Amino acid sequence: MNAKGKVIKYGNNVDTDVIIPARYLNTSDPAELASHCMEDLDEKFTQRVQKGDVMVAGKNFGCGSSREHAPISIKASGISCVIAETFARIFYRNAVNIGLPIIECSEAAKDIKDNDQVEIDFDKGLIKNLTTGKTYQGQPFPEFMQEIISADGLIQYIKNSLS
């Protein structure tokens, strides 16, 4: 599994309340959630995000309230992957469960700049900054977790396993 796109970068401690504000939790429609993704942190996010873009952030990405709405809004906005120094554990699990590819790599998250072009090889955990030519080694998921993400999330993975 691979991803390639332009970087949209954020800092440390980006919490689920700014990823998708609580006032929008009354819907589970991915398109509606995407239209409000990051709006309290970055008013222009929905205007500048393109399908395939890669979100890069610092430490503790997705901290705060446990809500699947956060990774759903990111995925539905067109983001193909999130790279961070670290993820809050509940966000990490929710991202896998809904099929949003994520990867931890402190060095990449620190070095990569907004608007850089990056390519991610999830099987190897490799992140290549196509703008600078630098390559980083991230932590790849175990095979079974990659299968869940590739299946578009845990529910579809289970459905596929039962059929």
From Swiss-Prot:
InterPro entries: Aconitase/3IPM_dehydase_swvl, AconitaseA/IPMdHydase_ssu_swvl, IPMI_Swivel, LeuD, LeuD/DmdB_bac, LeuD_type2/HacB/DmdB. It comes from Ruminiclostridium cellulolyticum (strain ATCC 35319 / DSM 5812 / JCM 6584 / H10). Catalyzes the isomerization between 2-isopropylmalate and 3-isopropylmalate, via the formation of 2-isopropylmaleate. It catalyses: (2R,3S)-3-isopropylmalate = (2S)-2-isopropylmalate. The lineage of its organism: Bacteria, Bacillati, Bacillota, Clostridia, Eubacteriales. Keywords: Amino-acid biosynthesis, Branched-chain amino acid biosynthesis, Leucine biosynthesis, Lyase. The keyword Heme does not apply. SUPFAM superfamilies: LeuD/IlvD-like (SSF52016). Belongs to the LeuD family. LeuD type 2 subfamily. Its EC number is 4.2.1.33. GO terms for biological process: L-leucine biosynthetic process. The keyword Ribonucleoprotein does not apply. One of its GO terms (molecular function) is 3-isopropylmalate dehydratase activity. HAMAP family: LeuD_type2. Pathway: Amino-acid biosynthesis; L-leucine biosynthesis; L-leucine from 3-methyl-2-oxobutanoate: step 2/4. Heterodimer of LeuC and LeuD. This is 3-isopropylmalate dehydratase small subunit.
